Design a protein with these regions (language model features):
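A gly/proline- and charged-residue-enriched helix-loop-helix capping module
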Residues: 13-21
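Catalytic-loop motifs flanking and including active-site residues across diverse enzymes
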Residues: 26-33, 100, 123, 156, ...
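Generic secondary-structure signature for well-ordered alpha-helical cores
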Residues: 39-43, 52, 106-113, 129-132, ...
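Zn-dependent metallopeptidase/amidohydrolase metal-coordination segment
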Residues: 115-160
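An extended, acidic, His-containing surface patch that forms the Zn2+-binding/catalytic region
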Residues: 87-131, 181
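His/Asp/Glu-rich mid-to-C-terminal helical/loop segments that flank catalytic regions of hydrolases
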Residues: 144-189
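Acidic/histidine-rich catalytic neighborhood of metal-dependent amide-processing enzymes
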Residues: 21-96, 116-117
């Protein structure tokens, strides 16, 4: 993992020649985490948009009606086991001095998320811009993404799932209004 520890990992190999191939962990791990959270809560929704890696096409066309009762979004599409996105393409995902972040910060740190980064785009940015709510994007336990050496660390996926559960319990069903200031160079609206 990111700390150099040996952990149980999932990796894919080609059937025809036994060589490593990409596992698609950057998508699959995040989807798995969301499915686990859907089993733990009866008051949350999941949104699985298409074509994130070619311009967040699904999020750009997200149905406003679906998001009318959404108070915030948590995405699991950051690398490794200790990262989260502070901003995506220069667009901040939440206000640092907000109740949203103040309630969450300790929980985030307790789960080992200590590398807070400025990342390229992912769906949380588009949803925040489009629907004016605060978002997080957390590590999903995948490493060496988009390469034949990609792998997923099981313990890291479990930690991210537990992080999501703790945050949902703490943040509850409140609406955390946030309209990001879009960097005009990157704004999609």
């Amino acid at each position: 993992n990111a700390q150099g520890d040996m952990k149980l990992s999932l990796k894919a190999y080609r059937k025809d020649n036994g060589l490593p191939t990409g596992i698609g962990g950057d998508d699959k791990a995040g989807i798995f985490i969301c499915l686990q959270l859907l089993e733990r809560f009866d008051n949350i929704k999941a949104f699985f948009p298409v074509a994130e890696e070619i311009g967040c096409k699904g999020s750009l066309k997200a149905d406003e009606e679906f998001f009318q009762d959404v108070g915030y979004a948590i995405q699991f599409d950051s690398t490794e086991n200790d990262t989260m996105s502070l901003s995506l393409m220069g667009t901040q995902l939440f206000e640092y001095e907000s109740d949203f972040f103040k309630k969450s910060k300790g929980i985030i740190l307790e789960h080992g998320i200590t590398e807070w980064k400025h990342h390229p785009y992912t769906d949380a940015m588009v949803l925040s811009q489009k629907f004016s709510f605060a978002c997080f994007n957390f590590a999903a336990g995948y490493y060496k993404y988009h390469t034949s050496e990609e792998y997923v660390v099981v313990e890291d996926v479990v930690n991210s799932t537990n992080l999501g559960e703790s945050l949902i319990k703490e943040l509850g069903e409140e609406h955390y209004q946030y309209k990001p200031q879009s960097n005009s160079k990157y704004s999609w609206f």
